[in-house]
């Protein structure tokens, strides 16, 4: 069972001020997780968390993370712009993009961001549009499958991201000749792992690669970016990741591989968007309809516009009915109102018998929730609300209005 970070009474009060649906974030929880992460990697003097803006691109959230000592991982012009305007500067910004437009490389250089090259071919392109920086990172893709024990976690060979080992080594050689003085290695080999072993195993592979690359190229390796991949327990029966255990696991591998190779100075970076935010967000929605045909359908005022993951990935998000806990249960599909049959938050889920007007919370929407929203069926994206440490709630993004949807159109006047 998952317990929301707000009570029924708090939610009822919030819905008087903020109409459903809306995303709700927990400031205290965000800060607690950021501090736990920094404590877990305190053994590494240069450790830095670069929060992936794409997970939760809201300035109010990013300001909290800036206050907690985090940098940001960016992948587009607007994400770079947001980082700059919020006060992230220089090495506090990681720019990890692919198929990158020229203007984005130029802007990243203007801001002094650390560029993480996705492709060997990007060297010539980067050189043609802007100057080569003194510090640069390259993204590695080992190919094959990524395994933890007997479990296949992901298939890097099918991923469009990163370079082969041979390409990465050649990239380092050429970039060194072009004047790069400090290098980094980056890799993401699996997504949303719920295992304390993922980061240590990824670290082992990258640390062994680092030793080989330095031996063959003679470059100064300044940092290794473990990227993301540490997930959250979307399902209540899953054991959540323990970041302290994960950090100590990486520490052991660091001492085993990098220190003996004379690389004890290497800084460790992470990009933990999902781990940092997912569990600290809820999608608050109200039951508006109930329908019985071959199945029982619980209709809510949210839709895939507000949370795409179940429709896109078949992802599980736990649902709590805040009005009913001890009632008899029923098996239902929880659905939105889009003209698409995949607009379902839950399929054949056992929930307390639900009635129209009930408040539901959909858990773990703090990352890749609002940010993946869209406007199909001319649906409007919801508000975002921050539950502050002092218990007060603050609107940090208003709900869209019809005028917002129509603002970019020509030849249409909403006032007529």
Walk through the language-model features, giving the residues of each.
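Structured core elements
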Residues: 71, 94, 114-116, 137-139, ...
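Generic secondary-structure signature for well-ordered alpha-helical cores
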Residues: 20, 35, 39-43, 131-132, ...
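Conserved, mostly hydrophobic/aromatic
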Residues: 30, 54, 76, 108, ...
């Amino acid at each position: 069972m998952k317990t929301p970070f707000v009570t029924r009474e708090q939610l009822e009060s919030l819905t008087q001020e903020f109409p459903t649906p809306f995303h709700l974030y927990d400031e205290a929880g965000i800060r607690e997780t950021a501090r736990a992460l920094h404590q877990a990697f305190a053994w590494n003097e240069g450790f830095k968390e670069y929060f992936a803006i794409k997970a939760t691109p809201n300035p109010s959230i990013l300001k909290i993370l800036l206050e907690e000592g985090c940098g940001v991982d960016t992948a587009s012009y607007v994400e770079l712009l947001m980082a700059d305007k919020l006060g992230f500067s220089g090495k506090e910004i990681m720019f990890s993009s692919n198929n990158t437009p020229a203007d984005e490389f130029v802007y990243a250089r203007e801001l002094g961001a650390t560029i993480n090259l996705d492709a060997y071919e990007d060297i010539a392109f980067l050189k043609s549009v802007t100057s080569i920086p003194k510090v640069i990172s390259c993204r590695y893709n080992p190919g094959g499958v990524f395994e933890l024990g007997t479990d296949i976690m992901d298939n890097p060979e099918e991923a469009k991201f990163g370079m082969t080992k041979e390409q990465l080594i050649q990239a380092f050689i050429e970039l060194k000749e072009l004047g790069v003085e400090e290098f980094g290695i980056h890799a993401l080999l699996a997504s949303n792992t719920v295992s304390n072993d993922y980061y240590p195993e990824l670290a082992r592979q990258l640390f062994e690669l680092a030793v080989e690359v330095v031996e063959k190229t003679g470059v100064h390796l300044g940092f290794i970016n473990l990227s993301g991949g540490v997930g959250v327990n979307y399902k209540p029966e899953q054991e959540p990741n323990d970041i302290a255990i994960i950090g100590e696991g990486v520490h052991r591998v660091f001492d085993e591989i990098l220190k003996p190779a004379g690389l004890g100075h290497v800084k460790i970076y992470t990009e933990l968007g999902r781990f940092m935010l997912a569990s600290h967000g809820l999608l608050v929605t109200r039951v508006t309809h109930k329908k019985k045909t071959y199945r029982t359908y619980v209709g809510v005022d949210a839709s895939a516009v507000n949370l795409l993951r179940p429709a896109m990935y078949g992802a599980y998000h736990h649902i709590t009915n805040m009005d009913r806990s001890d009632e008899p249960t029923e098996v239902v599909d929880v659905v939105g109102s889009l003209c698409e049959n995949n607009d379902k938050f839950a399929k054949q889920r056992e929930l307390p018998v639900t009635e129209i007007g009930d408040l539901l919370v959909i858990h773990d929407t703090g990352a890749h929730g609002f940010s993946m929203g869209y406007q199909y069926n001319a649906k409007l994206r919801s508000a975002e609300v921050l539950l502050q440490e002092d218990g007060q709630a603050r609107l940090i993004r208003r709900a869209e209005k019809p005028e917002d949807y129509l603002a970019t159109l020509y030849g249409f006047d909403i006032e007529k």
